[in-house]
Amino acid sequence: MEQEQDCDRMGSVGQTMTNGGMQAMRILICAHDFQPNPSPQSLRVTQLASGLASLGHDVHVLTRACGAGMRRMEDPPGLQVHRTSPQGVEALIDVTSRVLGHLRRLRRQDAVAGTRPSPQVASQAAPTAGTAALNRKGRAIAWLRSFLDARVFPDGRSRWIGGALRHGRQLISQWSPQVIIGSHEPVAGLLLASALSRESGIPFVAELGDPVLTSYTPERWRAASLELERRVCHEAAAIVVTSEATAALMQERHGPGIAPLSVIPQGFARVEPPLPEVVRSAGGLQLVYTGRFYPFRDPMPLVRAVLASPGCTLTIAGPGLPPELAKACAEHPQVLRFAGSLDHSQAIELQRSADVLVNIGNAGMTQIPGKLLEYLGSGRPVLYLQPDAADPAAAIIGRERCGFLAANEVAAISALLHELLQRKQQGRLDEGLRLGQDAFAEYRWDRLAERLAAVCRDAAMAGQRQA
């Protein structure tokens, strides 16, 4: 009887064949963050969804309507993307933010008289009475969003779930997906997928990425986060995390009865045809850091080490800087260069121009920075700054021979920078390292999507679990 049920489930997965000769699946992905949202999770979901579609699967994405300030982009080919508004106050905030953003752009155009700032420096246009008024309104919106976040678990993004749930029910009745993927972070995608799965009986895959309960979870939501994490781990047909350390943490927290765990790390996009070689400066050591800064990633030991190392420069690209780092960039513009926020293709181009790419580990956490694995596709060595002995990402540097490792301390970084300067002067900077996309093909998003497809197929056969 069990064998007959398994055959029935496999038969229900569909008769269309994928590019690899397997039966195609109908997959619904629930993700609050999706292209053009610039968040790291948006990049992950967009790449994995595109990879599933490229394999021949029928993939629909249920996501939030584009927020204010997001650059309009075409949806990735092969995907059906359904965007729903959060409604209510969140929708009003979106509209107000768009209006303020448009007014800011007009002010900037007037201030710079039609010129554009260099992509390597931050714009320093002086504020006017008009921009001050816009800043006050922007702060008021930020305060309102913070106020609303404090009253919804775990933040205001969960207000998107209501409208998305109604659209998801309609989509399921018309299209009948065989598996649902819930994306985290934020929690909204996970909550939506879980609700749709319970209502429909369709199994869901918890694409956790990182734990729901983390070191930065607000105290008021810690108990609720742990309970949601527990329920999802027992209710989902499969769980996906980004590191072995996170998988071990889930088993330790929630016991051996949880759903099957798979580790699918972050990755990088395949580039075809291969990009041309970059001609780099013969003098000095050019360091590049792309990405965000968080309270658990301290950039100041790196900054102090660079300032103490003649011949080194550091270019930073990201959505913003911590105050102390912003001050240092303003005081040392020839050494510390802030490129501002770049789109993904611009960030990749900047990475390829570097002598060495810098990544800072997450202190006290099991997560591996996604940027570290993205760097593997750039063809450049990585300087990884290890925050503590338990950091799981540090092992990647030694195992993959992709760069250099130092404690996130000024003395250790300074000593390594001195060594790297010498290696470059001697023409040995890349010596002994594995570099380039071909060396790390297992981290390409298209390969990772194949692994996610296998997880989805197993989940569809296993069926829905009960929490």
Residue ranges and their predicted role:
Residues 230-259:
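A short, active-site helix/loop in glycosyltransferases that binds the activated sugar's phosphate group
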Residues 237, 351-367, 380-383:
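Acidic donor-binding loop of glycosyltransferase active sites
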Residues 47-48, 166, 188-191, 195-198, ...:
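Membrane-proximal helix-turn-helix segments that form the acceptor-binding/catalytic region
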Residues 200-205, 213-231, 270, 295:
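Nucleotide-sugar donor phosphate/pyrophosphate-binding loop at the beta->alpha transition
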Residues 245, 266-267:
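Carbohydrate-associated surface elements
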Residues 316-318, 323-348:
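Nucleotide-activated donor-binding/catalytic signature segment of Leloir-type glycosyltransferases, i.e.
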Residues 2-4, 9-90, 96, 238, ...:
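N-terminal subdomain of nucleotide-sugar transferases
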